[in-house]
């Protein structure tokens, strides 16, 4: 019985470590687009208010999406 408890504890701890390794790479904030630049008066200020370091309008032909980055 004691051996079963130790084995189950080992499995739980191993699962937690593996889960942490998978999740830790995704914790860093990725660039996020928050809306169109037409709707936001100042893209950079809107991003800073949301906790990002800066923001800029991006797009292929016309920069019309406000995207924030850390």
From Swiss-Prot:
Record-annotated disulphide pairs: 33-68, 37-57, 43-66, 47-67
Annotated signal peptide: 1-29
Keywords: Antimicrobial, Disulfide bond, Fungicide, Plant defense, Secreted, Signal
Biological process, per Gene Ontology: defense response to fungus; killing of cells of another organism
Annotated compartments: Secreted
Record's GO cellular component terms: extracellular region
Predominant subcellular localization, coarse grouping: secreted
Family per record: Belongs to the DEFL family.
Protein name (record): Putative defensin-like protein 73
Lineage: Eukaryota, Viridiplantae, Streptophyta, Embryophyta, Tracheophyta
Gene responsible for this protein: LCR44
